[in-house]
Amino acid sequence: MSDETVLPLQFTEAAAKKVKLLISDEENPNLKLRVYITGGGCSGFQYGFTFDDQINDGDMTIEKQGVELVVDPMSLQYLVGGAVDYTEGLEGSRFIVTNPNAKSTCGCGSSFSI
């Protein structure tokens, strides 16, 4: 049996490493990466990322490599079982969300429908 806690959302090593680097560049160790869902995009909902130095009541935090990912409760319900990752490729570098709850996604991967 594993001692590792199963979290409703995964924060990959690659994403944590990039967040740590970006926070270092900003010279503000209180920053956290916030992922959120808003209405919009070509599929109905879209993912958003921002740096935030606040944790609000009800927010879930996931710590990895000394940095935190923050998700509000409304967004979390759409992200359960998913993962926040960071990728670099021919199309550029970006944070991405792998979301098993999405019935369809747009070509750019930043919007989805449930």
From Swiss-Prot:
GO process terms (BP): iron-sulfur cluster assembly
The record's free-text note on cofactor binding: Binds 1 iron-sulfur cluster per subunit.
GO cellular component: cytosol
Keywords per UniProt: Iron, Iron-sulfur, Metal-binding
PROSITE patterns tied to this protein: HESB (PS01152)
Pfam family, one: Fe-S_biosyn
Binding residues for iron-sulfur cluster: 42, 106, 108
Function recorded in the entry: Required for insertion of 4Fe-4S clusters for at least IspG.
NCBIfam families, alphabetized: iron-sulfur cluster assembly accessory protein (TIGR00049), PRK13623.1 (NF010147)
SUBUNIT field: Homodimer.
Protein's UniProt name: Iron-sulfur cluster insertion protein ErpA
Protein species of origin: Yersinia enterocolitica serotype O:8 / biotype 1B (strain NCTC 13174 / 8081)
